[in-house]
Amino acid sequence: MENKEIVLDELKYLYTEGYIFGDIAHFHDTYTYEDNGVNKAYFELSEDEELEVLEEYVKYRKQRRLLNE
């Protein structure tokens, strides 16, 4: 599995509602100090890959919100 997919899947698994900025900050704080596959994938992302993950995550959250309305 590609690093982007690992990180995006973890974001989708952990954070499905609430404030996106808070979710991203919490994710960063959590995976800065953990030593696991998600941590390694997260820190191997390039800047472009990080943006792609964020774009996909925001798109996912928008779709979930629209489905719940």
Regions found by a protein language model. Name each.
Residues 1-69:
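Structural boundary micro-motifs
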